[in-house]
């Protein structure tokens, strides 16, 4: 895409704002290289990449990338035999640390949110290499500034000797400086360092009283820095040890550099992936600042930008407009007052397309649609060249000639005030001829003009649409609202009336214009009113469609969760049934074994085929992974509303609330109300209640099978839960429902942790969608 176009559309300012959001020089480098792509697959992938990271960024706290830096130069130097210093090794260590933190974050993200997939980030995480050994080798050898003493046995020994020798030197020099006899001879009673040697400051007149080497003197010459002869040899020893230390440090750093060189390819991959992540996160941060949304890219030529606004203007004051090339429309001509926002509309369209093809979310409402353009050409603003002494018209025409040479059917062309700067009649004719030529090429065109002749241009040409920017005659100022499909109309009479011009003059002026022009203005005014009404209705329709899609997605997820839960329950029931049958079979085997032993010992009259028969009957009940429950329905009176029934498919008791028809009834099971087939219901005979059981049944009726904890404080909720569970156990309930609501999830977590430890609870689970979903926990009592 032409650099001139990007400059006119101020894309560099957008890049600068994205660059401000980067953390590392890796991310900054990628922002500086960011350019609009023109390949359809590349554009789509870049947008998916940014959108996926933006979703995660908007929902979760991402790991810090602080300290991430470009290390490829160090890696290449290590590969050719150079030796890295501690600072460079620490930057490599930080790269490994950052990538490991991101991998840990992603793994936790996947575990917590199993239903959501992030394929692009997943691919990047799979690319990240395992560099744990290299990290530990660097981390255990050096800190931010230097090698650890225990980096090697030799280094530890050398530094220990340096420390002990320094201590002896200090003790020796301390005795000298603290001696009463030397107090008047010293400039200061301290030990200092000159030329890496320990020295004492001696007044020049007492030089002869101290044997040793003079290493320095003060600016005035009154103080000499002398290394006493008593410590010269020890200082020499320190120098030798420092040399040995440097050699050992070089050896250790060479070894660490070798480890880096061995992992060079993996480190370069890690740098590339983490730099790309920094770049994408910067895009996500910027996108959130402009409330960017993801457009849908289409192979067919399409432009639909609902409520788009220019991202460099103040979002609080800028007017958002819907920009759309409707079906079969290739040219849009915008008319309206000067300073009414026509040029901003052109720049908004051009800049949003450049942003979208660079992988940036765009400042529009959800649902935008775009095609991919090979190039965007602009003739916007006054680009008059003083050096070339070109007029405004010549400057524009030079630019237009260049555009017409290169534009094709894959181009978007933006003309600002087409044909301006010359005689109006010639300018209008040129404008129409240029538009005809570009339409023949097949480019998509948006042009602004103030020529009234161009209002009629769309009426005798296919694929051309008028648009206008609105003017408020009450405030005598533009509203900056774009009206697609509505040509601009003259407001001269209304403005003159508002400013106080005599009605006689205005009415006479109206008689001087043709009837046709008057009717056209009235028609345009009617179009404006209808456009506003239709636009409001369409925005409301878009909102409702979006809400419906969201509800559909939520229901689909809940249905999938229900199916998974149902499947797990069935598998669990099968497993439990198999275990019971296995236990029964084993018990039967033991019984048969005992009977055989009894027959052998006692001579009991037990026939072998009878034993085998009984064993086979038990085996027939066992089904590997498929247990069928054959239920023989009891025949009682006809089921009516109010009857207590057993729901055969669920094995639960319930009460019939309503008979829907001959085949279906509505049944209440606990807190669940369901419509079920009558053939799935078995009428229960009412049992006579024994007097001795009255206490239990009375108690059972005093509490419900559900406990509502919504609105409770955490501690109060747990106290209430304990009391309720005690009563539920006394009432012989097998299952109860704890309603805690969704909220932040804190109360749900607390309730479930408490149930896990409670002595009366054997199991619990989250509620199914029909039971209240995530806002309910179902507890099974022992």
Curated annotation (Swiss-Prot):
ATP binds at residues 336-343. Residues 707-782 form the Smr domain. PROSITE patterns: DNA_MISMATCH_REPAIR_2 (PS00486), SMR (PS50828). The keyword Transport does not apply. Signal peptide: none annotated. Its EC number is 3.1.-.-, 3.6.4.-. It is an enzyme of class 3 (hydrolase). Pfam families: MSSS, MutS_V, Smr. It comes from the Bacteria. The keyword Mitochondrion does not apply. GO terms for biological process: mismatch repair; negative regulation of DNA recombination; rescue of stalled ribosome. GO terms for molecular function: ATP binding; ATP hydrolysis activity; ATP-dependent DNA damage sensor activity; endonuclease activity; mismatched DNA binding; ribosomal large subunit binding; rRNA binding. Keywords: ATP-binding, DNA-binding, Endonuclease, Hydrolase, Nuclease, Nucleotide-binding, RNA-binding, rRNA-binding. Belongs to the DNA mismatch repair MutS family. MutS2 subfamily. Endonuclease that is involved in the suppression of homologous recombination and thus may have a key role in the control of bacterial genetic diversity. Acts as a ribosome collision sensor, splitting the ribosome into its 2 subunits. Detects stalled/collided 70S ribosomes which it binds and splits by an ATP-hydrolysis driven conformational change. Acts upstream of the ribosome quality control system (RQC), a ribosome-associated complex that mediates the extraction of incompletely synthesized nascent chains from stalled ribosomes and their subsequent degradation. Probably generates substrates for RQC. Homodimer. Binds to stalled ribosomes, contacting rRNA. HAMAP family: MutS2 (MF_00092). This is Endonuclease MutS2. The gene is mutS2.
């Amino acid at each position: 895409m032409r650099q001139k176009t990007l400059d006119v559309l101020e894309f560099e300012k957008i890049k600068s704002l994205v660059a401000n959001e980067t953390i590392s020089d890796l991310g900054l480098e990628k922002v500086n290289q960011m350019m609009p792509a023109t390949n359809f697959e590349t554009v789509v992938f870049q947008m998916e990449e940014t959108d996926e990271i933006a979703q995660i960024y908007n929902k979760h706290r991402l790991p810090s990338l602080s300290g991430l830096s470009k290390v490829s130069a160090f890696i290449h130097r290590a590969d050719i035999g150079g030796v890295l210093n501690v600072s460079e090794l620490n930057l490599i260590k930080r790269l490994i640390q950052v990538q490991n933190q991101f991998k840990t974050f992603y793994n936790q993200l996947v575990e917590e949110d199993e239903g959501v997939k992030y394929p692009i980030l997943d691919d990047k995480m799979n690319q990240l290499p395992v560099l744990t050994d290299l990290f530990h080798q660097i981390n255990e050898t050096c800190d931010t500034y230097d090698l650890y003493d225990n980096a090697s046995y030799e280094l530890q020994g050398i530094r220990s000797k340096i420390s002990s020798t320094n201590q002896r030197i200090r003790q020796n020099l301390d005795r000298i400086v603290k001696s009463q006899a030397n107090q008047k001879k010293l400039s200061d009673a301290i030990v200092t360092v000159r030329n890496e040697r320990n020295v004492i400051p001696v007044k020049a007149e007492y030089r002869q009283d101290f044997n040793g080497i003079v290493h320095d003197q003060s600016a005035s010459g009154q103080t000499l820095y002398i290394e006493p002869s008593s410590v010269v040899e020890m200082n020499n020893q320190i120098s030798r040890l420092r040399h040995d230390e440097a050699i050992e440090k070089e050896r250790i750093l060479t070894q660490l550099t070798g480890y880096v060189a061995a992992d060079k390819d993996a480190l370069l991959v890690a740098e590339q992936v983490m730099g790309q992540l920094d770049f994408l996160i910067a895009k996500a941060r910027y996108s959130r600042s402009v409330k960017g949304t993801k457009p849908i890219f289409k192979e067919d030529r399409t432009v639909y930008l609902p409520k788009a606004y220019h991202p460099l203007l103040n979002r609080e004051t800028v007017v958002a407009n819907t920009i759309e090339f409707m079906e079969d429309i290739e040219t849009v001509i915008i008319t309206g007052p000067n300073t009414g926002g026509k040029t901003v509309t052109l720049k908004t369209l051009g800049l949003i397309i450049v942003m979208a093809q660079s992988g940036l979310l765009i400042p529009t409402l959800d649902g935008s649609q775009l095609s991919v353009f090979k190039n965007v050409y602009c003739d916007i603003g006054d680009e008059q060249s003083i050096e070339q002494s070109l007029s405004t018209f010549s400057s524009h025409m030079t630019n237009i000639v260049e555009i017409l040479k290169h534009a094709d059917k894959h181009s978007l062309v933006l003309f600002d005030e087409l044909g301006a700067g010359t005689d109006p009649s010639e300018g209008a004719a040129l404008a129409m001829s240029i538009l005809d030529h570009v339409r023949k090429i097949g480019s998509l065109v948006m042009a602004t003009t103030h020529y009234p002749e161009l209002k009629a241009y769309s009426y005798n040409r296919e694929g051309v649409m008028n648009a206008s920017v609105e003017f408020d005659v009450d405030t005598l100022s533009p509203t900056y609202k774009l009206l697609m499909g509505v040509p601009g109309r003259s407001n001269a009479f209304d403005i003159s009336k508002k400013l106080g011009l005599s009605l006689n003059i205005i009415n006479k002026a109206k008689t001087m214009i043709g009837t046709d022009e008057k009717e056209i203005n009235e028609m345009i005014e009617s179009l404006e009113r209808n456009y506003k009404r239709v636009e409001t209705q369409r925005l409301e329709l878009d909102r409702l469609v979006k809400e419906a899609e969201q509800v559909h997605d939520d229901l689909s997820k809940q249905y999938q969760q229900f199916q998974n839960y149902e499947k797990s329950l069935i598998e669990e029931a099968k497993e439990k049934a198999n275990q019971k049958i296995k236990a029964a079979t084993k018990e039967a085997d033991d019984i048969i074994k005992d009977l055989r032993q009894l027959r052998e010992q006692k001579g009991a009259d037990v026939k072998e085929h009878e034993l085998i028969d009984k064993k086979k009957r038990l085996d027939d009940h066992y089904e590997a992974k498929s247990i069928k429950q054959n239920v023989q329905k009891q025949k009682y009176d006809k089921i009516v509303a109010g009857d207590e029934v057993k729901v055969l498919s669920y094995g639960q008791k319930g009460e019939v609330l309503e008979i829907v028809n001959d085949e279906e009834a509505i049944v209440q099971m606990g807190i669940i109300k369901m419509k079920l087939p009558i053939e799935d219901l078995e009428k229960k005979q009412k049992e006579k209640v024994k007097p001795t059981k009255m206490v239990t049944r009375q108690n059972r009726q005093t509490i419900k099978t559900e406990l509502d904890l919504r609105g409770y404080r955490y501690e109060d909720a747990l106290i209430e839960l304990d009391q309720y569970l005690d009563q539920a156990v006394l009432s012989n309930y097998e299952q109860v429902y704890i309603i805690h609501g969704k909220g932040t999830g804190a109360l749900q977590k607390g309730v479930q942790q408490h149930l896990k430890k409670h002595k009366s609870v054997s199991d619990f689970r989250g509620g199914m969608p029909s039971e209240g979903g995530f806002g309910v926990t179902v507890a099974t009592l022992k």
